[in-house]
């Protein structure tokens, strides 16, 4: 019942966008409906979540511009790497239960190389956000402020991460709202200068 109400509300919002955005949003529906099943079939459900969850970035861009160019795709790919990292961390909270019932995840796949995998995810996040900022012609303020959340990722998250400590994993996972907020405020600042 609630799913039907939410779908109806989403549809009401959706019809207010331009046709291109509506078509892109409808094209994303298979992603949204199949994501919950991914842990049964692949070790990459976090990647699938990143592709699905961050699709809103593309929709936001097209709803404003009416078109699609490489810039939002660059930020989209960076955001996918971010989700891949933070949701892998989240997955370590219940990794033992997932293994017992036969579910799959990047947390399980990379449990012996977790910090390396997370570092790689965050490295590519940084690269894509830097490239995106360059193509948006953001000035030095964007790149300077961006150092703060990137330090947070590597100094706090990677350094403090403990695969067998669910409380630390949850704390690190939740700290991603700080990362996102700083990046968001940073973009607002440079776009309004």
Question: Predicted segment positions?
Answer:
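Intramembrane alpha-helical segments
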Residues: 1-74, 131, 153-163, 167, ...
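Cytosolic, membrane-interface loops and tails of multi-pass inner-membrane proteins
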Residues: 3, 87-111, 159-168
């Amino acid at each position: 019942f609630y799913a039907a109400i939410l779908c109806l509300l989403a549809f009401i919002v959706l019809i207010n966008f331009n046709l291109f955005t509506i078509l892109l949003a409808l094209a994303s529906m298979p992603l949204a409906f199949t994501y919950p099943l991914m842990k049964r079939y692949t070790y990459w459900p976090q990647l699938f979540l990143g592709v699905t969850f961050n699709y809103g970035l593309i929709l936001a861009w097209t709803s404003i511009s009416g078109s699609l160019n490489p810039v939002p795709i660059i930020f989209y790919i960076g955001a996918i790497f971010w989700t891949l990292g933070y949701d892998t961390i989240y997955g370590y909270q219940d990794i033992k239960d997932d293994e017992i019932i036969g579910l799959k995840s990047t947390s399980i796949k990379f449990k012996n190389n977790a910090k390396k995998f997370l570092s790689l995810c965050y490295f590519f996040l940084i690269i894509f956000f830097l490239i995106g900022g360059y193509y948006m012609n953001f000035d030095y303020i964007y790149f300077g402020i961006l150092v703060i959340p990137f330090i947070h990722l590597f100094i706090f998250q990677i350094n403090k991460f403990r695969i067998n400590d669910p409380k630390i994993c949850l704390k690190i996972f939740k700290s991603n709202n700080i990362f996102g907020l700083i990046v968001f405020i940073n973009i607002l600042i440079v776009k309004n200068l």
